[in-house]
Amino acid sequence: MAATAQRPRRFIDRGAITAAWVGVGMAVTIGVSFLLVIPIEPIYWYLALPAGLMIGYYANARSRREGGPWGRVLLNGLAAGIATGITYALLLLAIKALFFTADNGFRDGGQSLVCQTGAECVYQRYLAAGQGEALAAAGVTDGASFTALYWREQLSTATLVFVLATAGGLGGAFLYGVTNRRRATDEVAPTA
Protein backbone atom coordinates (compact mmCIF):
# COMPACT_ATOMS: atom_id res chain seq x y z
CA MET A 1 0.00 0.00 0.00
CA ALA A 2 1.46 3.33 -1.03
CA ALA A 3 1.69 6.04 1.56
CA THR A 4 -0.43 9.02 0.65
CA ALA A 5 -0.20 12.49 2.08
CA GLN A 6 -3.25 13.32 4.12
CA ARG A 7 -4.82 16.72 3.85
CA PRO A 8 -5.13 18.73 7.04
CA ARG A 9 -8.57 18.45 8.59
CA ARG A 10 -8.45 21.80 10.36
CA PHE A 11 -8.23 25.36 9.13
CA ILE A 12 -5.66 26.10 11.79
CA ASP A 13 -3.14 23.94 13.61
CA ARG A 14 -3.55 22.64 17.16
CA GLY A 15 -0.61 24.76 18.21
CA ALA A 16 -2.45 27.85 16.98
CA ILE A 17 -5.47 26.90 19.10
CA THR A 18 -3.20 26.65 22.12
CA ALA A 19 -1.63 29.99 21.18
CA ALA A 20 -5.10 31.55 20.92
CA TRP A 21 -5.76 30.54 24.53
CA VAL A 22 -2.37 31.93 25.50
CA GLY A 23 -3.44 35.16 23.78
CA VAL A 24 -6.64 35.22 25.84
CA GLY A 25 -4.57 34.85 29.01
CA MET A 26 -2.12 37.50 27.87
CA ALA A 27 -4.96 39.96 27.15
CA VAL A 28 -6.49 39.31 30.58
CA THR A 29 -3.13 39.80 32.28
CA ILE A 30 -2.44 43.05 30.43
CA GLY A 31 -6.00 44.24 31.11
CA VAL A 32 -5.91 43.54 34.83
CA SER A 33 -2.45 45.10 35.07
CA PHE A 34 -3.17 48.35 33.23
CA LEU A 35 -6.91 48.84 33.69
CA LEU A 36 -7.28 47.79 37.34
CA VAL A 37 -3.99 47.49 39.24
CA ILE A 38 -2.10 50.40 37.69
CA PRO A 39 -4.89 52.20 35.81
CA ILE A 40 -3.01 53.71 32.88
CA GLU A 41 -5.35 53.01 29.97
CA PRO A 42 -3.11 54.33 27.15
CA ILE A 43 -0.54 51.64 27.97
CA TYR A 44 -3.31 49.08 27.41
CA TRP A 45 -3.96 50.54 23.96
CA TYR A 46 -0.28 50.70 23.04
CA LEU A 47 0.32 47.06 24.00
CA ALA A 48 -2.43 45.71 21.71
CA LEU A 49 -0.22 45.63 18.60
CA PRO A 50 2.87 44.08 20.23
CA ALA A 51 0.66 41.52 21.97
CA GLY A 52 -0.82 40.56 18.61
CA LEU A 53 2.62 40.38 17.00
CA MET A 54 3.89 38.04 19.70
CA ILE A 55 0.84 35.78 19.61
CA GLY A 56 0.84 35.54 15.80
CA TYR A 57 4.50 34.53 15.84
CA TYR A 58 3.94 32.13 18.74
CA ALA A 59 0.96 30.45 17.02
CA ASN A 60 3.26 29.28 14.24
CA ALA A 61 6.22 28.46 16.47
CA ARG A 62 3.90 26.34 18.61
CA SER A 63 2.60 24.66 15.43
CA ARG A 64 6.13 24.11 14.08
CA ARG A 65 5.23 25.71 10.78
CA GLU A 66 8.80 26.17 9.54
CA GLY A 67 8.71 26.57 5.81
CA GLY A 68 5.02 27.14 5.27
CA PRO A 69 2.60 26.84 3.61
CA TRP A 70 1.93 30.57 3.69
CA GLY A 71 -1.85 30.23 3.84
CA ARG A 72 -1.66 28.07 6.94
CA VAL A 73 0.97 30.31 8.56
CA LEU A 74 -1.23 33.39 8.08
CA LEU A 75 -4.41 31.61 9.24
CA ASN A 76 -2.68 30.44 12.42
CA GLY A 77 -1.61 34.00 13.22
CA LEU A 78 -4.99 35.44 12.28
CA ALA A 79 -6.89 33.01 14.52
CA ALA A 80 -4.64 33.67 17.51
CA GLY A 81 -4.79 37.43 16.84
CA ILE A 82 -8.60 37.39 16.67
CA ALA A 83 -8.87 35.51 19.98
CA THR A 84 -6.46 37.97 21.59
CA GLY A 85 -8.23 40.98 20.05
CA ILE A 86 -11.71 39.87 21.09
CA THR A 87 -10.54 39.33 24.65
CA TYR A 88 -8.72 42.67 24.63
CA ALA A 89 -11.85 44.53 23.44
CA LEU A 90 -14.37 42.71 25.65
CA LEU A 91 -12.24 43.13 28.76
CA LEU A 92 -11.93 46.87 28.10
CA LEU A 93 -15.71 47.19 27.71
CA ALA A 94 -16.44 45.03 30.76
CA ILE A 95 -14.18 47.08 33.03
CA LYS A 96 -15.57 50.34 31.65
CA ALA A 97 -19.13 49.06 32.25
CA LEU A 98 -18.27 48.08 35.81
CA PHE A 99 -16.91 51.50 36.71
CA PHE A 100 -19.57 53.35 34.70
CA THR A 101 -22.51 51.66 36.42
CA ALA A 102 -20.95 51.57 39.90
CA ASP A 103 -19.80 55.21 40.14
CA ASN A 104 -21.49 56.63 43.23
CA GLY A 105 -19.82 60.04 43.14
CA PHE A 106 -17.21 59.43 45.84
CA ARG A 107 -14.15 61.68 45.55
CA ASP A 108 -10.69 61.33 47.05
CA GLY A 109 -11.14 64.47 49.15
CA GLY A 110 -14.03 62.87 51.00
CA GLN A 111 -16.80 65.02 49.54
CA SER A 112 -19.13 63.11 47.25
CA LEU A 113 -20.73 64.50 44.14
CA VAL A 114 -24.48 64.91 44.42
CA CYS A 115 -25.74 62.50 41.79
CA GLN A 116 -27.54 59.25 41.09
CA THR A 117 -25.21 56.21 40.92
CA GLY A 118 -24.10 55.39 37.39
CA ALA A 119 -24.12 57.59 34.31
CA GLU A 120 -25.19 60.74 36.15
CA CYS A 121 -22.23 60.49 38.55
CA VAL A 122 -19.77 59.89 35.72
CA TYR A 123 -21.20 62.92 33.89
CA GLN A 124 -20.94 65.08 37.04
CA ARG A 125 -17.37 63.87 37.56
CA TYR A 126 -16.43 65.07 34.04
CA LEU A 127 -18.12 68.43 34.70
CA ALA A 128 -16.27 68.80 38.02
CA ALA A 129 -13.00 68.12 36.20
CA GLY A 130 -13.62 71.14 33.94
CA GLN A 131 -14.75 69.24 30.84
CA GLY A 132 -18.12 71.03 30.56
CA GLU A 133 -17.23 73.17 27.52
CA ALA A 134 -15.74 70.25 25.60
CA LEU A 135 -18.78 68.11 26.36
CA ALA A 136 -21.17 70.90 25.34
CA ALA A 137 -19.26 71.29 22.06
CA ALA A 138 -19.82 67.56 21.47
CA GLY A 139 -23.58 68.02 22.05
CA VAL A 140 -23.70 66.67 25.60
CA THR A 141 -26.27 68.43 27.75
CA ASP A 142 -27.34 65.79 30.27
CA GLY A 143 -26.67 62.29 31.58
CA ALA A 144 -28.43 60.58 28.66
CA SER A 145 -26.50 62.42 25.94
CA PHE A 146 -23.30 61.88 27.94
CA THR A 147 -24.02 58.13 28.11
CA ALA A 148 -24.47 57.96 24.32
CA LEU A 149 -21.19 59.82 23.73
CA TYR A 150 -19.31 57.81 26.34
CA TRP A 151 -20.28 54.41 24.95
CA ARG A 152 -19.74 55.49 21.35
CA GLU A 153 -16.18 56.44 22.30
CA GLN A 154 -15.64 53.23 24.29
CA LEU A 155 -16.85 51.09 21.36
CA SER A 156 -14.51 53.01 19.08
CA THR A 157 -11.58 52.30 21.41
CA ALA A 158 -12.56 48.63 21.75
CA THR A 159 -12.72 48.32 17.96
CA LEU A 160 -9.30 49.93 17.69
CA VAL A 161 -7.63 47.52 20.14
CA PHE A 162 -9.35 44.56 18.44
CA VAL A 163 -8.05 45.66 15.03
CA LEU A 164 -4.55 46.30 16.40
CA ALA A 165 -4.31 42.88 18.09
CA THR A 166 -5.73 41.09 15.03
CA ALA A 167 -3.44 42.96 12.63
CA GLY A 168 -0.59 42.20 15.00
CA GLY A 169 -1.48 38.50 14.81
CA LEU A 170 -1.20 38.63 11.02
CA GLY A 171 2.01 40.64 11.26
CA GLY A 172 3.52 38.15 13.70
CA ALA A 173 2.59 35.28 11.38
CA PHE A 174 4.20 37.12 8.46
CA LEU A 175 7.38 37.71 10.48
CA TYR A 176 7.45 34.05 11.43
CA GLY A 177 7.01 33.02 7.81
CA VAL A 178 9.79 35.31 6.61
CA THR A 179 12.26 34.33 9.31
CA ASN A 180 11.59 30.59 9.36
CA ARG A 181 11.77 29.49 5.73
CA ARG A 182 13.28 26.09 5.02
CA ARG A 183 16.50 26.14 3.12
CA ALA A 184 18.11 23.30 1.17
CA THR A 185 20.77 23.01 3.88
CA ASP A 186 18.03 22.47 6.48
CA GLU A 187 16.87 19.22 4.91
CA VAL A 188 17.87 16.11 6.78
CA ALA A 189 19.84 13.61 4.72
CA PRO A 190 18.45 10.06 4.70
CA THR A 191 20.39 7.60 6.80
CA ALA A 192 21.47 4.18 5.62
Placement of each model-derived feature along the sequence:
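Transmembrane alpha-helical insertion/packing segments
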Residues: 1-67
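Low-complexity, intrinsically disordered extramembrane tails and loops of integral membrane proteins
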Residues: 1-10, 182-192
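Membrane-helix interfacial "entry" motifs
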Residues: 10-14, 37-41, 65-73, 77, ...
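Hydrophobic, lipid-facing residues on alpha-helical transmembrane segments of integral membrane proteins
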Residues: 16-28, 32, 50, 54, ...
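Membrane-interfacial segments
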Residues: 36-41, 63-68, 95-103, 107, ...
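Cytoplasmic membrane-interface segments at the C-terminal ends of transmembrane helices
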Residues: 56-77, 170-188
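Functional transmembrane-helix hotspots
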Residues: 91-131
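Individual transmembrane alpha-helix segments
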Residues: 135-167
